Amino acid sequence: MADDLDFETGDAGASATFPMQCSALRKNGFVVLKGWPCKIVEMSASKTGKHGHAKVHLVGIDIFTGKKYEDICPSTHNMDVPNIKRNDFQLIGIQDGYLSLLQDSGEVPEDLRLPEGDLGKEIEQKYDCGEEILITVLSAMTEEAAVAIKAMAK
């Protein structure tokens, strides 16, 4: 019976988000808008009306797609804030549009897609020239994306 259990693929049960009161959110911070992890680019608060609470108007840009999302919530309500991790990994290969990155543990995951646009072209160009580069990977809410590159320190 106990031999049937497989714990290798589980996580520690950590939540992908944590609650924060709407009035405590700040511009350039992060928040979940319409189910997407976003960076807050605009924020405005309205005064308490005759019927109800002060409201906070949030405008955010999705950290993965760049799409714009808006939401309005009472300042006393809680909003979800995504747990965001930012890590640098050494690029060791590109195959079929996916990056092979060397992690600190020595593992080499090959499931991160090469970003589209200028960043993807720059990564390919530097890799083809034989440059050693670090890829900055942003992780939030079970999604990952390469967001920046930098030269490796010699």
Swiss-Prot record:
Residue(s) carrying Hypusine: 50
Domain of life the protein comes from: Eukaryota
GO cellular component: endoplasmic reticulum membrane; nucleus
Cysteine pairings via disulfide bonds: none
Localization annotation: Cytoplasm; Nucleus; Endoplasmic reticulum membrane
Annotated signal peptide: none
Gene3D superfamilies per UniProt: 2.30.30.30, Nucleic acid-binding proteins (2.40.50.140)
Pfam families with a match to the protein in the record: eIF-5a, IF5A-like_N
Modification(s) after translation: Lys-50 undergoes hypusination, a unique post-translational modification that consists in the addition of a butylamino group from spermidine to lysine side chain, leading to the formation of the unusual amino acid hypusine. eIF-5As are the only known proteins to undergo this modification, which is essential for their function.
Presence of the UniProt keyword S-adenosyl-L-methionine in the record: no
Family as reported in the entry's similarity comment: Belongs to the eIF-5A family.
Descriptive protein name: Eukaryotic translation initiation factor 5A-1-like
Species this protein is from: Homo sapiens (Human)
Taxonomic lineage: Eukaryota, Metazoa, Chordata, Craniata, Vertebrata
Gene (name only): EIF5AL1
